[in-house]
Regions:
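Non-catalytic, topology-defining segments of multipass membrane proteins
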Residues: 1-174
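Alpha-helical transmembrane anchor segments
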Residues: 160-195
Length: 195
């Protein structure tokens, strides 16, 4: 019985740690630093946070450059057809996730036209983003999550958390973008559903 409780704790600790470490990477490095340039850091620290983001986000690693450009597009085009992830143009949360994924891939692969201004001063480490965002690396992360659960999960339902690990970044983004627009609040009047 002691072993069962230990394994449950390991799964719980792993899930909570992955959730918050990934959320911090997205909030601190991708959102506040990359998209909004709320503070500055030297190139060495930038690379430290690229690596931190890769470890924390794992299979859902997002290029800070692409994230920053998309987030700037979101602010510039809030609640219009050009907004890369407004719930106003999605019938449900899943269609918004799929649309956002296609927008992200389009910006990443340069199949969607993006104004140069949206790329201004964004952190850029091309080879690292290419490696960290590759399908092979994403699959290796997914396998690592599955192996962790094989070793420590004590019941079948714990494996239902594995897809959340695999899609952690998009899950965070969806929660913020769907629910903040649908049920959030504002401190001042805005002419869109941003909250």
């Amino acid at each position: 019985m002691q072993n069962c409780k230990k394994s449950n704790m390991e799964i719980l600790i792993f899930f909570i740690a992955h959730w918050y470490l990934s959320l911090f990477a997205q909030s601190f490095f991708h959102h506040r630093y990359s998209a909004h340039q709320m503070f500055s850091m030297n190139k060495f620290m930038e690379k430290v946070f690229f690596i931190y983001s890769f470890i924390a986000q794992g299979s859902s690693y997002m290029s800070p450059k692409v994230y920053g450009a998309m987030h700037r597009m979101h602010h510039a085009y809030a609640d219009t057809e050009k907004d890369p992830h407004s719930p106003k143009y999605s019938s449900n949360i899943i269609t918004m996730m799929v649309k956002t994924y296609h927008q992200f891939r389009g910006v990443q692969n340069k199949t969607i036209e993006v104004r140069d201004a949206f790329y201004k001063n964004l952190p850029d480490w091309k080879w690292f983003d290419k490696m960290a965002g590759s399908l092979v690396v994403k699959l290796l992360w997914a396998i690592a999550y599955i192996l962790f659960y094989i070793k420590f999960a004590t019941t079948w339902w714990m494996f239902l958390l594995v897809p959340v690990h695999i899609l952690m970044g998009p899950v965070h983004g969806t929660i913020v973008n769907w629910f903040a627009h649908k049920i959030g609040y504002t401190n001042h009047d805005v002419d869109n559903t941003s909250k």
